[in-house]
Amino acid sequence: MNLDRVIAVRTNKTVYRDGDKCIKVFDSDYSKADVLNEALNQARIEETGLNIPKVLEVCTIEGKWAIVSEYIKGKTLSQLMQEHPEKKDEYLRLFVETQLLVQSKTCPLLSRLKDKMNRKISQADLDATTRYDLHTRLEGMPKHNKVCHGDFRPSNVIISEDGTPYVIDWSHATQGNASADAARTYLC
């Protein structure tokens, strides 16, 4: 694999292009379990029929874990908004439509958002009474099963040359309440 062409640098990872492949190489101290979970999430989302890059392989490169997937030629919505501020409303509409499409799908094998939130509450630096109250409130909420991206932002939507939106970065994907996922998008 040729790792000469860097296309993105993010916390704990660098993304490269090698022809028609995209190679996300994680830092050497990045958890193997987290890499495999991200690849598994992406593979499971492929089965929903959403436009996403297909996982081709998971491997190690010079002792670092990597996910190899299809390269999607295009620009992120974030890039397009910066390059064409006069079209920002059009791009925001496409962004919202894409999130609604993602959230219209179900994927029963994804982890549950409620379980993830329960773990986060348990690990939070809160007194026992507050943790108990939060766990109780969370348990009392209705059960949902919609696909939740978990990090939906304009930099995670690539618009291909033919105008098709592709959603990337499925490391935080869960199934749960689509409104909670939309709220997270709005707050971030």
Annotate each language-model stretch with its function.
Residues D4-L36, A43:
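ATP-binding glycine-rich loop module of kinase domains
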Residues L40-N51, V102:
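Structural motif at the C-terminus of the N-lobe alphaC helix and the adjacent alphaC-beta4 loop
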Residues K54-W65:
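Short beta-strand micro-motifs within the conserved protein kinase catalytic domain, predominantly
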Residues G63-T76:
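Conserved short submotifs of the Hanks-type protein kinase catalytic core
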Residues L77-E86:
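AlphaC helix of the protein kinase catalytic domain
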Residues E86-K114:
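Internal "kinase-insert"/substrate-recognition segments embedded within catalytic cores
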Residues S104-G150, I158-D162, Y166:
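An alpha-helical support segment within catalytic cores of ATP-dependent transferases
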Residues T164-C188:
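Active-site Asp-x-Gly
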